[in-house]
Amino acid sequence: GREHSFPPAFIQRVDELGAPHGITGQMVKLGGTKMDEPSRYRVIVDRISHEVEYYRGAMKHAVLQGGYVINNPFWWTADDKYFNYSVMAKLGVAIPRTVLLPQKGYPADIDLTGESLHNLVYPIDWDALLDYVGRPAILKPYSGGGWKHVYKVADKRELLEAYDRTAPYCMTLQQFINFDHYVRCFTFGKDDIMPVRYDPRERRYIVDHEYLSPEVGSRVVADARTINKALGYEMNTVEFAIRQGVPYAIDFLNPAPDFERDRITPFYFDMVVD
């Protein structure tokens, strides 16, 4: 990844724990990958290939050559938030009502004609979509993260104003959960779940171990496990907006979570490294 604090701390911890077993950690180095080249690494913790296409291809090749990559680069490539919402709703996780929207515009290098879009219904019945998800609503990309291109809209006018700024991204329109509590769970190995109080408005982690009731905390952990086992993620963050005791899974496609010490607090940084 591109962080400054996590990679060296993690490598140091691997070296400390792995020394009796002949295991060492190091930064992966890539400089042109030959198709018959064996993987030089037994296990790779991938935290950047979603942003660098060459890295993603190299991670897939590493798997082919016998390496183990966290997270699985094939599923990560195929995944998107809207599909995940639909899967989890079928598995009984509380999910806000969500609509997948046609794109406002398309990348300039794609040669589209009127015939390319003849399957689209026009005009879109925006009132019906808002009636389904409720008002206010959240407009956000159907894939990607980092709180980019996320809008809270109160009505049709605000929705259309925001939608007009979203090209070339495919977006979702989602029910807004006016939460009483909000948590972000660090998850590892699918089963190791660490719920953390989180302020999404300030994007700030808060050390508070009495934040959730035992009942809500247990459901948050159980739902996070369901999500990770269904999607196969071994490193992820899962966000829940909790309203009247019901945890709604808001965001859980984060296979390369931000682990920078100053942002997740020194307390949680040490736990994440371990």
Which role does the model predict for each range below?
Residues 2-115:
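Conserved N-proximal alpha/beta basic substrate-recognition cap immediately N-terminal to
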Residues 2-3, 50-51, 76, 143-145, ...:
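Short, solvent-exposed loop/turn segments at secondary-structure junctions
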Residues 63-66, 74-182, 214-222:
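Active-site nucleotide/adenylate-binding loops and adjacent lid/helix of ATP-dependent enzymes
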Residues 66, 201-209, 252-258:
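Short glycine/proline- and charge-enriched loop/turn segments
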Residues 152, 187, 240-242:
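Conserved hydrophobic "DFG−1" position in protein kinase catalytic cores
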Residues 161-163, 172-174, 182-199, 248-253:
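Beta-strand scaffold of nucleotide-dependent catalytic cores
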Residues 203-247, 271:
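A long amphipathic alpha-helix within ATP-dependent nucleotide-binding catalytic cores
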Residues 242-274:
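C-terminal active-site "lid" helix and adjoining low-complexity regulatory extension at the edge
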